[in-house]
Amino acid sequence: MIDRYKHQQLRIGSVSPQQISAWATKIIPNGEIVGEVTKPYTFHYKTNKPEKDGLFCERIFGPIKSGICACGNYRVIGDEKEDPKFCEQCGVEFVGSRIRRYQMGYIKLTCPVTHVWYLKRLPSYIANLLDKPLKELESLVYCDFSFARPITKKPTFLRLRGSFEYEIQSWKYSIPLFFTTQGFDIFRNREISTGAGAIREQLADLDLRIIIENSLVEWKLLGEEGPTGNEWEDRKIVRRKDFLVRRMELAKHFIRTNIEPEWMVLCLLPVLPPELRPIIQIEGGKLMSSDINELYRRVIYRNNTLTDLLTTSRSTPGELVMCQEKLVQEAVDTLLDNGIRGQPMKDGHNKVYKSFSDVIEGKEGRFRETLLGKRVDYSGRSVIVVGPSLSLHRCGLPREIAIELFQTFVIRGLIRQHLASNIGVAKSQIRENKPIVWEILQEVMQGHPVLLNRAPTLHRLGIQSFQPILVEGRTICLHPLVCKGFNADFDGDQMAVHVPLSLEAQAEARLLMFSHMNLLSPAIGDPISVPTQDMLIGLYVLTSATRRGICANRYNPCNRKNYQNERIYETNYKYMKEPFFCNSYDAIGAYWQKRINLDSPLWLRWQLDQRVSASREVPIEVHYESFGTYHEIYAHYLIVRSVKKETFCVYIRTTVGHISFYREIEEAIQGFSQACSYDT
């Protein structure tokens, strides 16, 4: 079992047969070594007790009931005075039943079996290390052809000498079928190699450091050649160079992690603890079993059959032995990854068996559902909605979630301020929603950041810290600019909220994980807090009204307001006078008073611009007043001049949307300039 206080991380990789054996085997007082599962049985149909040396054997995996052996004897767990620790009759250890959650067993395979993840998954690690085509290796693994063994200075049946480069495509026609089982086994071990055993031999002969050196030399030679002028040849060279890079990286990984390449071929097959593949009794006395149990039974059946062919029977043809080895390989493939080689295995009800890969991968797999996504204390979950008024480093927490997350802190605050005499009184005040509770909650939240996480957490920006504030409703409010880091949008996505408790976690949340400190992508360094989706649509709607200019909006009947089922008559059309405003505050105030719309054209007084006064543009209209002043109206601005043609002021034609957008940009630039001046 993994001790969370001793082990800070978990790594998944290949292990040696010796390590698998060490995990599973144990020695009972009579000197017998147990751990190997040899029988494909589960429970006896009469006694409902686990079969000895079966998939649920109590000697191998521990007792079903704590301190009770298979005979029914009881011993106190942890009492050193109670001897012995094993039952002398059945050999079951007197320990807690929880051991069945982590105690493993193993199946000793009669023939080596290639791990299908390393063979069939792309990229194929075995094909990369051996530098051979995947189809050729598959044919070798599934006994479609064989290699000649290197035998020197000895007479051979096939008269073959040399290395593995000589391949016999049709071994069944090259080898006479008059060999007996023992004779064929001796002949094969001496002169030919096929199946996963051939792969294991080649992997064992590899020198990873030589692979790195040779691959690097070949990569440099290909780089020095340059383009050939033939597009097809150039593509082959590029693909070869990419392959060599992957091969070197793979070899370095094996060296760095102390993994031997031949461990990708299994000699011992681990058996999962029984509690991870249970058999449950339902109504009516029927049993429901995990699919993995059936797949394990299939492996054991075929492995035992192969053992019988090689040990007991002497007249079995060698071809039958080959076929049985292939069946063992296919059974292990189905156990590890059902359907990876084509048609998946199904039960009697035409339902696909769930293999080991199906159990651990995906959203409902062991890692994402049970380990990474399990429920923990001081956490909550809700739908996210946009909070446009929030700062980048703030998030809005619903009152219902906030009072649950910070309940212990609020109780401590009530007791410290002598507002509650004990925990029970404090909880009753929280249930009654007294005003003092929300005041203390506000104080607590000011000093406590929270972590927001959206699954799947594929990179470090998938979980960030925020300063929480209380909001109404039952949804979490989030600034739209932080959505890209979470890969979230506001179409029903949910996010989890966690409270960091320790001082170390709070310091990490404040110094490293705040959203306004993670503005760049950790992968490529590009800005990640950029407007997307809803924000772009909002900016378009906010600023799209005046693009057509005064001519299109004022003189084109098609652009006038047209209500449903209402015809436009030129004679009845009445032009709505566009209002004038001295500053942006008056314009925005008129919008909030609903005197104008967000996209209503208006004239806003603006500072004099040298480009306007020097422009040679011809005005569209000129309005003269009784005092002698006149207005020159252009497409997007208006100039008020005196009789002497002096410029009094300039008005620009805009909308409230444009004004709001301009003010936000102006405030952001001013804030950035002030920050830069403080730094200098």
Swiss-Prot record:
Its EC number is 2.7.7.6. Keywords: Chloroplast, DNA-directed RNA polymerase, Magnesium, Metal-binding, Nucleotidyltransferase, Plastid, Transcription, Transferase, Zinc. Gene3D superfamilies: 1.10.40.90, 2.40.40.20, RNA polymerase II, clamp domain (4.10.860.120), RNA polymerase Rpb1, domain 3 (1.10.274.100). GO terms for molecular function: DNA binding; DNA-directed RNA polymerase activity; magnesium ion binding; zinc ion binding. GO terms for cellular component: chloroplast; DNA-directed RNA polymerase complex; mitochondrion. Zn(2+) binds at C69, C71, C87, C90. It is found in: Plastid, Chloroplast. Its cofactor is Mg(2+); Zn(2+). It catalyses: RNA(n) + a ribonucleoside 5'-triphosphate = RNA(n+1) + diphosphate. Pfam families: RNA_pol_Rpb1_1, RNA_pol_Rpb1_2. The keyword Chloroplast applies. InterPro entries: DNA-dir_RpoC_beta_prime, RNA_pol_asu, RNA_pol_N, RNA_pol_Rpb1_1, RNA_pol_Rpb1_3_sf, RNA_pol_Rpb1_clamp_domain, RNApol_RpoC1. Mg(2+) binds at D489, D491, D493. Its main location: plastid. GO terms for biological process: DNA-templated transcription. The keyword Transport does not apply. Binds 1 Mg(2+) ion per subunit. Binds 1 Zn(2+) ion per subunit. PANTHER family: DNA-DIRECTED RNA POLYMERASE, DNA-DIRECTED RNA POLYMERASE SUBUNIT BETA. DNA-dependent RNA polymerase catalyzes the transcription of DNA into RNA using the four ribonucleoside triphosphates as substrates. Belongs to the RNA polymerase beta' chain family. RpoC1 subfamily. In plastids the minimal PEP RNA polymerase catalytic core is composed of four subunits: alpha, beta, beta', and beta''. When a (nuclear-encoded) sigma factor is associated with the core the holoenzyme is formed, which can initiate transcription. This is DNA-directed RNA polymerase subunit beta'.
